[in-house]
Amino acid sequence: MRLRLIAVGSRMPKWVEEGWHEYAKRLPSELALELVEIPLNTRGKNADVARFIRQEGEAMLAKVGHNERIVTLEVHGKPWSTEQLAVELDRWRLDSRTVNFMVGGPEGLAPEVCARADQRWSLSPLTLPHPLVRILIGEQLYRAWTVLSGHPYHK
């Protein structure tokens, strides 16, 4: 099973890349974690933001295969405890489809992406910086795996 984070934005600070890679490499090969970056359209003073969101959404969905699972990261999604995420991760492993975690740009996800979601996940009711969200997703997936495998990381 593959886990993919499809996120709008590229050229992250070094600390973000290092944090992401640290958790991605900790996961076993049967739970490979991959990052797919969608370039952020440049927003100017008179930018057509709605068009940019739509274009970014189309680019995100173009990276998703026909039968792959989509989990959107949304403020109004369902909050999962670590244990609940571990249960979901176990279900996804049994399902064996690729799981795509979708993180939008500064204005959020395109409605078309949200409409395709199999599940909606909220990391927090707080507004979080998108670079930090990448690391949090990687860490939480790793932590969920440690719960399932009995690893002492989650104690």
From Swiss-Prot:
Homodimer. S-adenosyl-L-methionine binds at residues 73, 104, 123-128. The gene is rlmH. It holds the Pfam family SPOUT_MTase. It catalyses: pseudouridine(1915) in 23S rRNA + S-adenosyl-L-methionine = N(3)-methylpseudouridine(1915) in 23S rRNA + S-adenosyl-L-homocysteine + H(+). Keywords: Cytoplasm, Methyltransferase, rRNA processing, S-adenosyl-L-methionine, Transferase. The lineage of its organism: Bacteria, Pseudomonadati, Pseudomonadota, Gammaproteobacteria, Pseudomonadales. This is Ribosomal RNA large subunit methyltransferase H. It is an enzyme of class 2 (transferase). Signal peptide: none annotated. It comes from the Bacteria. The keyword tRNA processing does not apply. Its EC number is 2.1.1.177. Disulfide bonds: none annotated. It comes from Pseudomonas fluorescens (strain ATCC BAA-477 / NRRL B-23932 / Pf-5).
